[in-house]
Regions:
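Class I S-adenosyl-L-methionine-dependent methyltransferase catalytic core
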Residues: 1-27, 40-41, 46-51, 59, ...
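Short, charge-rich binding segments
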Residues: 56
Length: 215
């Protein structure tokens, strides 16, 4: 597996070791996993059969896949496992944003620990959602996404971006921001996004109140 380049130098230095740990945690069918260099280019070497292709395609560091045959590398076509383009996650740029590859890695490892059977779709909650990087990453992978964010400006930025993004992509969607009321008075806001069969819901509020907000 050819490792994807990272714009973050600190993250790039740790990428090979993180890629090893991620594949071990998410792909039980892979073995002999180790980082290697070919002509000065970092790769991740492993042994697996075709049943692992979907998992490999979702790896945060996967740029391309090759099969080692008689000392040569033969390209292997990866399945299209993402529901939306990667620019859903990469377009927003702001100070303090978590590295996109690292966010995907954390989501993959988290989902890899879930033992409950499911139809492929999960419900992902980020109780400190910021501007929605984790939520967008979950949507890309075909999961419903839920978030809570204390900062009103971050909430507004996430809502504005999603509305603009899906409108410009000409994708049928709804994105509604409504007030949240208690005892007849507004105490926050709620964003409900529906797109391509998926749901994203985000509240303004305290992470400690997540259970009540979604209850």
């Amino acid at each position: 597996m050819l490792l994807a380049p990272s714009a973050n130098r600190v993250y790039a230095g740790s990428a090979p070791q993180l890629a090893v740990a991620e594949l071990k945690a998410t792909c039980p069918g892979a073995s002999d996993i180790e980082p290697v260099e070919l002509a000065g280019v970092p790769y991740l070497a492993f042994t697996a059969d075709e049943r692992a292709l979907d998992v490999v395609a979702r790896q945060s560091g996967c740029f391309a896949l090759f099969e080692h045959v008689d000392g040569l590398l033969r390209p292997v076509e990866l399945p299209d496992v993402f529901q939306f383009p990667d620019d859903l996650v990469t377009i927003p740029k702001y100070q303090g944003k978590t590295n996109e590859q690292f966010t995907q890695l954390l989501l993959n490892v988290t989902l890899g620990t879930v033992t409950r059977e499911a139809d492929g779709r999960r419900q992902v909650l980020d109780p400190m959602a910021g501007r929605g990087t984790t939520l967008s990453t979950a949507l890309r992978q075909g999961h419903d996404a839920y978030g809570v964010e204390l900062d009103d400006k971050a909430f507004e930025a996430a809502a504005s971006f999603w509305k603009t993004y899906f409108r410009r992509k000409h994708m049928k969607h709804t994105a509604d921001v409504t007030p949240v009321k208690r005892d007849g008075r507004a105490v926050g806001r709620r964003l409900d996004l529906r797109v391509d069969g998926l749901t994203a819901t985000m509240f303004t509020g305290d992470a400690r109140d997540s259970a009540q907000l979604f209850g």
